[in-house]
From Swiss-Prot:
Coiled coil: none annotated. It comes from the Eukaryota. This is Nucleoside diphosphate kinase B. Major role in the synthesis of nucleoside triphosphates other than ATP. It comes from Macruronus novaezelandiae (Blue grenadier). Its EC number is 2.7.4.6.
Amino acid sequence: TFIAIKPDGVQRGLCGEVMKFIQPMKQHYLDLKDMPFYAGLCKYMASGPVFAMVWEGEGIVKMMLGETNPADSKPGSIRGDFCINIGRNIIHGSDTLENAKMEIGLWFKGEEFVAYAEKAKAWVYE
């Protein structure tokens, strides 16, 4: 899953807190271009730095992030603990595997990743 701590999260100094949970922005959000909030979203995302990363884990990343609307997020999730507004929910996570691949390709080059195969994974997951 592609992860980006949004400008409000960076400005609030929450990069470290989020880490404890172990191409241009217009192109990134191109699938939302027909939505009424698109221009405002692009302006907001360009208003400051973002901290981009890639997380991997079966069924855990979305649970750690919480729901898009912080009001629907459980305590113990990033959005449940640090957010109150859907428009400023501090973190982005890809909604599908296909979008994750596209978003990761916008932000990173393939050679920036290290292949890592955890041997115990076969014992934990079928």
